Amino acid sequence: MNAEVIIVGGGIIGCAAAYNLAKNGISVLVLEGSENIGNGGSTRNGGGVRQSGRDPRELPLVMYSIEHIWPQLSDMLDTNVEYYQEGNLRLGSTPQHQKILTGLADSAAAHGVDVRMITGDEARRINPYLSEAVTCASWCPTDGHANPLMATMGYYKMARRLGAHFISGEKVVELRKIKGAARQVVTASGNVYEGDKIILAAGYESRFIASTVGIDVPMQQVLLETLVTEAVGPMFWQMLGTADADFYGHQTEHGSFVFGLNSGLEPYAKPGKPLSSSIAASAACRGIMHYFPDLANIKVVRTWAGWMDACADHVPVISKVEEVPGLILACGFTGHGFGISPAVGLVLSQLAMEQETAVDLSALRYDRFQ
């Protein structure tokens, strides 16, 4: 099967790009290595849709997503993505935390984000479940959260409805050039697919696939862990984080809490097999109970782990590649991809269609590493 655009990777980035291309009448083929769409970080993350705490280079994408896409996304996809724009509290309890949070808030505010520092008492007025340990916080009222599974599946289903084709269990192992341009995709099963453009959005695997045409995106794998609790009655809707990044999360629409953290267990995980550990979950729970003592008796019902494709400078590569015409990179999202995915899907489609992009991507070009 051939298509005008081949997308390698069936996570939310690939699905969002497929949706935007198919909506414009472009024939699209999405190849996903695992048996399930969105089987990687796209459906395993904490669901944050945040501007606060981001590298300034990512802000145009997330600000565009929040202003123009997230509020309408459920209607666009005919799927409830459970988007709540109820703000983001990033918590601190020490003078060092105050310094960290002030730096993040000042940086974001300088780029037009509505974020400010507040006292512990002000934070407790926003969220009365916070403990007295909270002495400071950054507050961004326009941040929020959504359901990663529903958003990913929403993009997938609507892309299919618009004519995009998906093949799962088709692991891409090689790209091939024709007359100097990336045109063919080779899979582990020996199948060869051809397209006018190739979008590489396969997470950490993108590094190995890109290397087959001489391109190196400096990335490493980082292991993240997530825990989910039993469902309880509604308590609060803000997205949460901390100055030390020891946990992040929110309460979902159906009542459970979802919290995540970096586990640090990469040396112990087997290749391709994320390792979940009670050690990491316990560490997260201690931090959560420090700030939210009322959650102490809520039961944890499940934990899981997933790999994050961490770029060397902590922001993604979203870029054409001058050395390999026809190749478009979308990788290295470093755990920040979900919130910006609506805008990323849009700009990837615009790159593939040779259109001007909705936001400036110059700071995210591949050639910044050269």
Regions of interest found by a model, annotated:
Residues 1-13, 29:
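Beta1/beta-strand and adjacent pyrophosphate-binding region of the FAD-binding site
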Residues 22-42:
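Glycine-rich FAD pyrophosphate-binding loop
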Residues 38, 191-236:
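Central helical "cap/lid" subdomain
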Residues 46-126, 246, 287-289:
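Dinucleotide-binding Rossmann-like beta1-alpha1 core, especially the glycine-rich loop
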Residues 61, 90-100, 139-157, 273-280:
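Short beta-strand to alpha-helix junction loop
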Residues 138-189, 193-196:
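Helical element adjacent to the flavin cofactor pocket in flavoenzyme catalytic cores
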Residues 231-326:
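Active-site lid/adjacent beta-loop-alpha segment flanking the redox-cofactor pocket in flavoenzymes
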Residues 289-370:
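C-terminal catalytic lobe of FAD-dependent flavoproteins
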